[in-house]
Amino acid sequence: SLTHRKFGGSGGSPFSGLSSIAVRSGSYLDXIIIDGVHHGGSGGNLSPTFTFGSGEYISNMTIRSGDYIDNISFETNMGRRFGPYGGSGGSANTLSNVKVIQINGSAGDYLDSLDIYYEQY
């Protein structure tokens, strides 16, 4: 069954999607680029773009967050890894043995929140 968990704060403008991901980060996440669309600010360093293969999905994900998204990392069902990108602030939350269906969120000058839609295994 599909469920979701929201991390981070209440600011920013909403977005959603999921076929490729990149981030801009320094001590926290300035922006997330999903399917080539930039959500957030222009600070920080740009990560390589992670493009999902056929049948590939996020199976384990760790997000550090407080009022903003501080750090993100994930591993796919095919063993490929992304991150960690960002800093050590906020509290860590891990989603394990999941199939991430969609990533929604909100962003302004920084990445305010992520709302992860997933199936639990």
UniProtKB/Swiss-Prot annotation:
InterPro entries, A to Z: Jacalin-like_lectin_dom (IPR001229), Jacalin-like_lectin_dom_sf (IPR036404)
Ribosomal protein keyword on record: no
Record SMART domains: Jacalin
Keywords: Lectin, Mannose-binding
Domain of life according to the entry: Eukaryota
Keyword Transferase included in the entry's annotation: no
Pfam family, one: Jacalin
Signal peptide: none
Alphabetized GO MF terms: carbohydrate binding; D-glucose binding; D-mannose binding; identical protein binding; N-acetylgalactosamine binding
Residue ranges constituting the Jacalin-type lectin domain according to the UniProt record: 1-120
UniProt record similarity statement: Belongs to the jacalin lectin family.
Function: Mixed specificity lectin with anti-HIV activity. Binds to HIV envelope glycoproteins, including exterior membrane glycoprotein gp120, and inhibits viral entry into cells. Binding to gp120 is dependent on gp120 being glycosylated, and is inhibited by mannose, glucose and N-acetylglucosamine.
Name of this chain's protein: Griffithsin
